[in-house]
Regions:
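N-terminus-centered regions that define maturation/targeting leaders and the start
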Residues: 1-138
């Protein structure tokens, strides 16, 4: 896609625990609010994560996500992880990983659904969410 820096473009290992009552699935997103687009940049969107799954292994996006998980279109134009690569010399960019506890078994979306539409669906179906932020500059 013409985007890529260091690190081999591996999706990170992430784990979680303590889901709230009523969680029927999870969704995981990664968003860069500092991208010079005027609207940020979606790096990863994974939905319909079964509640029994509490970890994604290193490079799960490329190696094959566990059964049931759907990755949807990011701002790279396709589903799957796209690693950080801010413009050279730009200020450090924030990469916000958000885990949503979702009340539905599955969001009514498909692989080509935009991150904006997934975000809309999550806005109305998230029970609780938590976030982790990383910084990257080159």
């Amino acid at each position: 896609y013409g985007f890529g820096c260091a690190g081999g473009n591996l999706s990170p290992q992430l784990s979680w625990s303590g889901a709230p009552d009523g969680t029927n699935s999870f969704a995981l997103t990664c968003f860069d609010p500092d991208a010079p687009t005027g609207s940020g940049f979606w790096h990863w969107v994974a939905v319909n994560i079964p509640p029994s799954i509490t970890e994604l292994s290193l490079n799960a996006s490329a190696d094959g996500m566990p059964d049931g998980i759907l990755e949807t279109r990011t701002d790279f134009g396709a589903p799957g992880w796209g690693g950080p690569c801010p413009p050279e010399g730009d200020h450090p960019h924030r990469y916000v990983f958000t885990l949503h506890a979702v009340g539905l078994d599955a969001l009514p979306v498909e692989a080509d659904t935009s991150a904006a539409v997934v975000g809309f669906m999550l806005n109305f179906n998230t029970i609780e969410k938590t976030a982790l932020m990383g910084l990257y500059k080159r």
